[in-house]
């Protein structure tokens, strides 16, 4: 076979001529300040628009290039008062797009070099280590952040922290300011890598590399001064800052930057913004394509309702794009569009921080031209970029056309070096200036597609997780031979997102008598650690004898070799042996299904959880099998249908998740021999683990379904108990005072865990009750080492707004949207409770009512239970204090996050030690939902560990 030729668009020696796309003016800028200046002078009335994390579409803030220039120049002039030398690195740690854009340009105009800091780790030790590393790397510690960011790094000494709010306050008019004039090869912007193989590296991009990339992108995208783009990627990512801001700015294009929470929380927001703003270019990762498709493909009520004629191209990157997902998304857009003949171009691309984001693209109408492979091809390089695939062993020998190998790229958009790290820089390039991407690619007929990864990360829904960190934790699992474990990224055929496989050598022989029990316990522990760290269990866990785990000459286990053996079927005998032993272990504890009710329930469990009914045991637990809050609702609905019952109370499923126990309860319902159970607020959602239990108090909706998804992350770590309000069951009276609630819950906690130390937390309304329980326990002489207050201010419990309570409950049940809560509240307050319930019922999606098996009477009763709690809190006034407190806060529904944090800090008056205030993803109503619970649990568990629990 003939070696594959290097694929390029233009020779390197004429790249400078190619930096002038036909649609750019002849006076092409050579530095970033030139880009900014030209955009302002040539397109003064073109616009930058922003939607923050705390406002809705109607609160979009728009500013002209001219107005933005004045603000930036004023900030730059104020920055000079810091008296830093030209070229000083300023770490920018901000949340909102508008703040980031202004801060970066102010740094550039004042002669400083901005370094964009992504969200810091919730693990205190990791966060402190990272910040210290950055400080040493730059030989300085100047940070520009907001109050929330300052709060996160306040415990780290030696930092020179400047608040953006104070910088804005000190900024003057800025008219006399003379902007810094850099050279094209000066450092422009630094970007931090994910740190997946250690601490982050700082990627140095000069004015020249950034402008080369932006010219090439603009030419590829067909950008003009009349283009309109929409971006939701964070500004700390090269795709958000370079690809979707500086490149369009180079062409004078107007831009809309939307906080990611606005897109993820409302799938229709993406389409509405395209329609309302005539967006021509947008970005959507494979994860978002899949989510939007799932949420919208069955919304036949919206078919033909959106004017999507403006959108010319949707870029997709960050992870491989599944071809079937892209096609389903395009079909969904076609159905939703007013023009039934509309076509939609999805452009999968390849890029890295080191290449200024995308540098290889393949624009395709996936409905007219069906993709040839499981994942979309990534296409050909942009102008000036070259790519090749080589033998990964030597890094230089070209692979034949159609064969996989290490993907390498070169061109003027490739970074110049890693800041203060010559060793890493040197190892990243080979002779000829080729950059080693770390990805496995195939070039066939001039087009590139990826077939895997060499580098040590796994990408889950577009988020990169470090394989070395995962391996470090897995090495500590009992049953794993230390240093004989490797984890490697792997995407199974048909799987939408990347997964991973774990290879390890057991500390015990697989032929020993106790091997089944030990292997089962080891694999359960490996799954638990994996879910907690990267939100995903392994696709396969493969035990391999030590003498068959070959090492390289450097003493390392070769992930690439192990994955190749796995793909080739060479490890099949080890996989089969593991299945056999685990089957024996399950058989030892296996209890055969003995009654018709158990068999029927087992069938429902199997369908819901996608398991084989033949493997179901009578002692299987819904939650230990991976059941979620949605699965509880499905089990309730399917069970009521199967047994012809008017209702199986949700609380009974929560309290009886084991098949045999639930079967006995169902039998009692069928025979109408149900003995009335005494009210007990404790709902055990997870009972495994030896660490201090966590008690979680319900929010204002009174129920605990919202905690089901969270509880599973504590398996084999600590028991998780939820507290549910009184009044759901027939004959149960409502609570009448806060004191009654606290006395009842405290007694239940003491019955469940007689002695401290205790860990108590509450979500929203429950945060206030948790605070009162902690006070009561301390008054009884017990130690409370953790008091968690989740997103509620100290005096909120007394705010007796029954209308808002009804709407909040309705939102949590999926009956109304988050937007409806604020929109409907004013007009609903004058209505009677009956009229309010009727209005909510009319607004509720019929399919959701069927799914919940909800009737007007059930909704009314639920609302009454919730309302009774609000009535209890109407005279509540916080007093006294607890020894420790952790306050978790999300994005508010209105106003800034800083203002919300300021209100929350009143909790400081009620703690005898300085409380910790912890920023969590999502909004008040979504922080524990499916999209956010994985990140919330990591943050929450980190705080428990920080408190010594």
Curated annotation (Swiss-Prot):
Gene3D superfamilies per the UniProt record, alphabetical: 3.30.300.30, ACP-like, alpha/beta hydrolase, N-terminal domain of ligase-like
Keyword annotations of the record: Phosphopantetheine, Phosphoprotein, Transferase
GO molecular function: acid-thiol ligase activity; transferase activity
InterPro entries associated with the record: AB_hydrolase_fold, ACP-like_sf, AMP-bd_C_sf, AMP-binding_CS, AMP-dep_synth/lig_dom, ANL_N_sf, ATP-dep_AMP-bd_enzyme, PKS_thioesterase
Carrier domain boundaries: 592-670
Superkingdom of the source species: Eukaryota
Temperature optimum or stability note: Optimum temperature is 20 degrees Celsius.
O-(pantetheine 4'-phosphoryl)serine modification, residue list: 629
One BP annotation, GO: biosynthetic process
The protein's role, per its UniProt record: Inactive atromentin synthetase homolog. While the invA3 adenylation (A) domain is capable of adenylating 4-hydroxyphenylpyruvate (4-HPP), the invA3 enzyme is inactive because of its non-functional thioesterase (TE) domain.
PANTHER family associated with the record: LONG-CHAIN-FATTY-ACID--COA LIGASE (PTHR43767), NONRIBOSOMAL PEPTIDE SYNTHASE PES1 (EUROFUNG)-RELATED (PTHR43767:SF1)
Family stated for the protein in its record: Belongs to the ATP-dependent AMP-binding enzyme family.
Name of protein: Inactive atromentin synthetase invA3
């Amino acid at each position: 076979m003939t070696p594959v030729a290097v694929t390029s668009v233009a020779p390197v020696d004429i790249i400078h001529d190619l930096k002038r796309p036909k649609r750019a003016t002849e006076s092409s800028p050579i530095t970033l300040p030139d880009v900014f200046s030209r955009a302002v002078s040539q397109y003064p009335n073109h616009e930058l628009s922003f939607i923050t994390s705390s406002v809705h579409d109607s609160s979009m803030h728009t500013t002209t290039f001219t107005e933005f220039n004045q603000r930036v120049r004023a900030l730059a002039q104020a920055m000079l008062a810091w008296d830093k030398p030209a070229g000083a690195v300023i770490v920018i740690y901000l949340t909102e797009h508008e703040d980031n854009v202004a801060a970066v340009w102010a740094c550039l105009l004042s002669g400083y070099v901005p370094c964009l800091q992504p969200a810091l780790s919730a693990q205190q030790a990791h966060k402190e280590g990272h910040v210290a590393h950055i400080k040493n790397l730059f030989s300085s510690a100047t940070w520009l952040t907001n109050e929330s960011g300052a709060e996160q790094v306040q415990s780290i000494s030696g930092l020179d922290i400047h608040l953006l709010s104070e910088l804005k306050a000190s900024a003057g008019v800025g008219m006399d300011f003379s902007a810094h004039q850099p050279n094209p090869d000066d450092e422009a912007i630094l970007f931090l890598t994910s740190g997946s193989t250690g601490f982050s590296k700082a990627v140095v991009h000069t004015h020249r590399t950034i402008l080369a990339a932006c010219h090439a992108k603009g030419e590829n995208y067909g950008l003009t001064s009349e283009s309109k783009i929409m971006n939701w990627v964070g500004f700390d990512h090269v795709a958000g800052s370079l690809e979707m801001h500086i490149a369009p700015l180079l062409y004078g294009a107007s831009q809309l930057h939307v906080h990611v929470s606005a897109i993820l929380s409302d799938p229709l927001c993406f389409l509405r913004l395209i329609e309302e703003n005539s967006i021509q270019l947008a970005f959507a990762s494979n994860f978002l394509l899949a989510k939007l498709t799932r949420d919208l493909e069955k919304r036949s009520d919206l078919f033909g309702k959106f004017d999507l004629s403006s959108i010319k191209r949707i870029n997709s990157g960050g992870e491989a794009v599944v071809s079937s997902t892209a096609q389903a998304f395009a079909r969904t857009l076609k159905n939703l569009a007013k023009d039934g003949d509309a076509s939609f171009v999805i452009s999968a691309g390849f890029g890295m921080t080191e290449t200024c984001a995308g540098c290889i693209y393949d624009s395709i109408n996936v409905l007219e031209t069906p993709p040839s492979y499981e994942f979309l091809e990534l296409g050909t390089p942009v102008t000036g970029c070259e790519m090749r695939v080589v033998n990964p062993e030597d890094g230089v020998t070209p692979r034949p056309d159609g064969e996989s190998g290490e993907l390498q790229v070169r061109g003027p958009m490739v970074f110049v070096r890693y800041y203060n790290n010559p060793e890493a820089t040197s190892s990243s390039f080979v002779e000829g200036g080729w950059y080693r991407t770390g990805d496995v690619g195939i070039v066939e007929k001039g087009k590139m597609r990826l077939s895997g990864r060499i580098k040590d990360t796994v990408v889950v829904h577009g988020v990169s997780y470090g394989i070395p960190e995962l391996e470090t934790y897995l090495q500590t699992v009992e049953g794993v031979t230390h240093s004989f474990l490797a984890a490697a990224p792997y995407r199974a055929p048909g799987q939408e997102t990347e997964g991973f496989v774990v290879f390890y050598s057991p500390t015990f022989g697989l032929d020993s008598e106790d091997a089944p029990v030990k292997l089962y316990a080891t694999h359960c522990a490996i799954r638990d650690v994996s879910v907690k760290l990267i939100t995903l269990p392994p696709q396969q866990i493969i035990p391999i004898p030590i003498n068959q785990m070959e090492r390289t000459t450097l003493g390392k286990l070769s992930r690439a070799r192990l994955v190749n053996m796995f793909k080739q079927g060479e490890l099949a005998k080890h996989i089969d042996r593991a299945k056999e032993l685990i089957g024996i272990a399950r058989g030892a504890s296996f209890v055969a299904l003995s009654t018709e009710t158990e068999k029927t329930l087992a069938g429902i469990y199997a369908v819901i959880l996608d398991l084989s009914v033949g493997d179901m045991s009578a002692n299987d637990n819904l939650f230990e099998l991976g059941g979620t809050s949605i699965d509880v609702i499905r089990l309730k609905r399917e069970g009521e249908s199967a047994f012809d019952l008017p209702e199986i109370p949700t609380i009974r499923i929560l309290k009886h998740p084991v098949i045999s126990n639930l079967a006995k309860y169902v039998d009692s319902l069928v025979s109408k021999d149900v003995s009335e159970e005494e009210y007990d607020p404790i709902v055990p959602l997870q009972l495994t683990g030896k660490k201090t239990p966590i008690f979680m108090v319900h929010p204002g909706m009174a129920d605990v379904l919202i905690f089901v998804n969270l509880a599973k992350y504590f398996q084999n770590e600590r028991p998780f108990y939820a507290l549910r309000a009184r009044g759901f069951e027939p004959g149960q009276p409502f609570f009448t005072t806060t004191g009654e609630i606290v006395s009842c819950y405290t007694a239940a906690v003491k019955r469940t865990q007689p002695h401290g130390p205790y860990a108590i937390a509450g979500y929203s309304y429950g945060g206030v009750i948790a605070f009162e329980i902690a006070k009561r326990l301390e008054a009884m002489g017990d130690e409370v080492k953790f008091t968690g207050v989740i997103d509620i201010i100290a005096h909120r419990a007394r705010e007796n707004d029954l209308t808002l309570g009804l709407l909040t409950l309705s939102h949590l049940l999926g009956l109304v949207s988050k937007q409806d809560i604020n929109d409907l509240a004013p007009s609903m307050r004058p209505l009677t409770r009956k009229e309010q319930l009727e209005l909510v019922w009319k607004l509720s999606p019929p399919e959701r009512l069927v799914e919940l098996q909800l009737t007007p009477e059930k909704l009314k009763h639920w609302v009454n239970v919730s309302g009774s709690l609000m009535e209890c809190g109407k005279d509540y006034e916080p007093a006294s204090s607890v020894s420790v407190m952790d306050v978790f806060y999300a994005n508010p529904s209105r106003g800034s996050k800083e203002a919300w944090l300021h209100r929350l800090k009143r909790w400081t008056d009620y703690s005898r030690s300085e409380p910790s205030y912890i920023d969590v993803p999502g909004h008040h109503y979504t922080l524990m939902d499916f999209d956010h619970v994985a990140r919330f649990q990591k943050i929450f568990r980190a705080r428990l560990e920080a408190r010594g629990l």
